Amino acid sequence: MEKLNIAGGDSLNGTVHISGAKNSAVALIPATILANSEVTIEGLPEISDIETLRDLLKEIGGNVHFENGEMVVDPTSMISMPLPNGKVKKLRASYYLMGAMLGRFKQAVIGLPGGCHLGPRPIDQHIKGFEALGAEVTNEQGAIYLRAERLRGARIYLDVVSVGATINIMLAAVLAEGKTIIENAAKEPEIIDVATLLTSMGAKIKGAGTNVIRIDGVKELHGCKHTIIPDRIEAGTFMIAGAAMGKEVIIDNVIPTHLESLTAKLREMGYHIETSDDQLLIVGGQKNLKPVDVKTLVYPGFPTDLQQPMTALLTRAKGTSVVTDTIYSARFKHIDELRRMGANMKVEGRSAIITGPVELQGAKVKASDLRAGACLVVAGLMADGVTEITGLEHIDRGYSSLEKKLEGLGATIWRERMTDEEIEQLQNS
């Protein structure tokens, strides 16, 4: 096991290149199951979730080659092998295998998702969609069993706006007979990205990115080449790090419109940000930052995935800021870790209340989930002294070459193997 050390206080300066979107990649890769010939996806992030998906596609008979961010999948010899246990449990987005395998094979057995523990992440909307298309769905011993004689298009209204359910229903519906309409669909950029891939494969999809998506089922889908969109959450994390510690940081390979909610909040605090077609410039180091209230919402609102890094930055603001997470109420495990570093904050219901300004101090902290890890990295950059972060398996699930990118901007950051004594202490904590 390893820990991440950060010697805080270094100014960040320069350009950072953003990787492909994790939240797109975990849906694009299962979508390749639906094709009848080779699919190439370019620009994938080199993170553990992608390697897990590669292994799962191989497990069901796919021929998969992945290097330098490019994955080539030949799905022709895939079979509808049950995946109730093993690697599938490591992956929160393993549920996309349900929609893709149901779409192609009319059956699937998928172990219930793993990944970050952020309170209940029910998949009832996914199941509602599959049932509407004609599937029989049962939950047996922690795995979802899906079976269908045939899939027929349906009108599906999502009770909750859900990115996962919207994509999963799209995956299952593209090869169904007739027309499917998804109402109250999520509008995230990642949904448009998946729809773009499916359309390149021959699917007929209209309305991706709006709240009504229309799909006309087709008989088969063919291979294609697709380039993934940039990761708006990684870009947002570096914007926050640049705001916290930057002189001038340029975020390269980004779609600025995907980050308007964060850009607006940083400007409200007093930061100077410039945008171009595929870059953002953020000027850090401002004094007398204003406190702001942040409320997470579905896209185009403030992303829940940036709520945690934002709480670290708000320790710099003079006054009281309130961060409310309307998406995942349990996403405040990072608050106790920030308090170990000297932050003045508390949790009330779905909100974190942050009072500043406070000079954070280096400490030993633990990442409980992916974005909590990002928050602690930002806090470590800001802190006086050395911060030791454990729980790196969470960070490695979602950030590609994080230390290398931060080092390139001037941070002092390194990994170390943990001693047996440290591992024992961690396991007992």
Swiss-Prot record:
<dbReference type="GO" id="GO:0008760">
    <property type="term" value="F:UDP-N-acetylglucosamine 1-carboxyvinyltransferase activity"/>
</dbReference>
<feature type="binding site">
    <location>
        <position position="305"/>
    </location>
    <ligand>
        <name>UDP-N-acetyl-alpha-D-glucosamine</name>
    </ligand>
</feature>
<dbReference type="GO" id="GO:0019277">
    <property type="term" value="P:UDP-N-acetylgalactosamine biosynthetic process"/>
</dbReference>
<dbReference type="GO" id="GO:0008360">
    <property type="term" value="P:regulation of cell shape"/>
</dbReference>
<comment type="function">
    <text>Cell wall formation. Adds enolpyruvyl to UDP-N-acetylglucosamine.</text>
</comment>
<dbReference type="InterPro" id="IPR036968">
    <property type="entry name" value="Enolpyruvate_Tfrase_sf"/>
</dbReference>
<dbReference type="GO" id="GO:0051301">
    <property type="term" value="P:cell division"/>
</dbReference>
<protein>
    <recommendedName>
        <fullName>UDP-N-acetylglucosamine 1-carboxyvinyltransferase 2</fullName>
        <ecNumber>2.5.1.7</ecNumber>
    </recommendedName>
</protein>
<keyword id="KW-0132">Cell division</keyword>
<keyword id="KW-0573">Peptidoglycan synthesis</keyword>
<keyword id="KW-0808">Transferase</keyword>
<feature type="binding site">
    <location>
        <position position="92"/>
    </location>
    <ligand>
        <name>UDP-N-acetyl-alpha-D-glucosamine</name>
    </ligand>
</feature>
<keyword id="KW-0133">Cell shape</keyword>
<dbReference type="GO" id="GO:0071555">
    <property type="term" value="P:cell wall organization"/>
</dbReference>
<feature type="binding site">
    <location>
        <position position="327"/>
    </location>
    <ligand>
        <name>UDP-N-acetyl-alpha-D-glucosamine</name>
    </ligand>
</feature>
<dbReference type="InterPro" id="IPR050068">
    <property type="entry name" value="MurA_subfamily"/>
</dbReference>
<keyword id="KW-0961">Cell wall biogenesis/degradation</keyword>
<comment type="similarity">
    <text>Belongs to the EPSP synthase family. MurA subfamily.</text>
</comment>
<keyword id="KW-0670">Pyruvate</keyword>
<comment type="pathway">
    <text>Cell wall biogenesis; peptidoglycan biosynthesis.</text>
</comment>
<keyword id="KW-0963">Cytoplasm</keyword>
<dbReference type="InterPro" id="IPR001986">
    <property type="entry name" value="Enolpyruvate_Tfrase_dom"/>
</dbReference>
<dbReference type="GO" id="GO:0009252">
    <property type="term" value="P:peptidoglycan biosynthetic process"/>
</dbReference>
<dbReference type="InterPro" id="IPR005750">
    <property type="entry name" value="UDP_GlcNAc_COvinyl_MurA"/>
</dbReference>
<feature type="modified residue" description="2-(S-cysteinyl)pyruvic acid O-phosphothioketal">
    <location>
        <position position="116"/>
    </location>
</feature>
<dbReference type="Pfam" id="PF00275">
    <property type="entry name" value="EPSP_synthase"/>
</dbReference>
<dbReference type="GO" id="GO:0005737">
    <property type="term" value="C:cytoplasm"/>
</dbReference>
<feature type="active site" description="Proton donor">
    <location>
        <position position="116"/>
    </location>
</feature>
<feature type="binding site">
    <location>
        <begin position="121"/>
        <end position="125"/>
    </location>
    <ligand>
        <name>UDP-N-acetyl-alpha-D-glucosamine</name>
    </ligand>
</feature>
<dbReference type="InterPro" id="IPR013792">
    <property type="entry name" value="RNA3'P_cycl/enolpyr_Trfase_a/b"/>
</dbReference>
<keyword id="KW-0131">Cell cycle</keyword>
<feature type="binding site">
    <location>
        <begin position="22"/>
        <end position="23"/>
    </location>
    <ligand>
        <name>phosphoenolpyruvate</name>
    </ligand>
</feature>
